[in-house]
Each structure stands twice: as structure tokens, then as C-alpha cells.
Amino acid sequence: MSLSIGEKAPDFSVNDQDGKPVRLSALQGKKVVLYFYPKDMTPGCTVEACNLRDNYKLLIKQGYEVLGISTDNEKTHQKFIAKENLPFRLLSDTDKQVHNLYGTWVEKSMYGRKYMGTARNTFVIDEKGIIEDIIEKVDTKNHTDQILRKGQANVASPAAKKVAAKKTVTKQPASKKAKSKR
């Protein structure tokens, strides 16, 4: 299934890391960041989750509820949350139903071998349950900034502000050589 910005986000109900059901439609009235990632405790997924963790207060301040979703089970999610001190819920989609609804269970290729896996995509869903943004080329180190960039150019994470500050430093002109004697 291919989804588009402006469409109603497909509703679903899956368990979080504690076995508690999470239904997307029950979150109406809140903005939701629904990020699909391949696997708990792998390098890229850890970088992405930690970027969201480090900027969680900023995301909450902007009104977002963050939900990660993978095909991992609840026990693996619990370990990942404990190890990385993640403040948001991780959803278990072991049967891949939500992945299929959102078009994130896809054929991939590595070293010429084809296999099925999770496309690292994020869906930003507004308070009415409408898809506001789809991020298909996720930058795991700067994911929060990708989420906030859409329509909110004045909001940036602390890491982005540091990068911006470094970029705005201007070089001082080279000192003029002393005039040689005539």
C-alpha cells in the first residue's frame, strides 16, 4: 500500500513493549511521530532512537507523541528501552500487519541478495489523524530535525543549533602584510 501526505493514516492496534494495546485512533487530538525501523539494538536503529531520545522534550513541547515500531517482540523492545533509556513506547508488529498497511515491509537487496525487510520510514500524523509528512530518506543522526523541519523552520534541536552556529562562523580576513619599504 502506498500512502500519501493528506490521506487519513490507517488505524491499527498493536501492543507496546509492556503488552498494552496501542490504537492509533485513540491518539487523535495529539500529533504522532510513527517511525518504522528495522531492528532493536542495531547500529543505525540505535542512533535513530537515541536522536529521538535526546530531543524528546523538544518533540513533546511541539505536541508530538513518539512511537517506534518494528517487527521485534515485546521482550526485545523492553531490553532496547532499558539499554538506551528510551522515554517513548515501542510497538511490536511481529505479524507485519501495520508494516503492510503503511507500505514499509518491502523487498530489499544487499550484495545482490533479495530479501524482505523494513523500510526506515517515518509518518508524521496530525491531531485529526491525517498524514502531515512522510520521511522516506531518514537521516538517523538528525531525525528530529527532519521531523521538525516541515513548516517549522524556527524550531531546531540543540545539536542542529550547534551545527548551525559552526556554519555561521565567518573567517577573519587574513592580516595585511606589512607594506615593504620603498
Describe the role of every protein-language-model region:
Residues 1-182:
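Chalcogenol-based redox active-site neighborhoods
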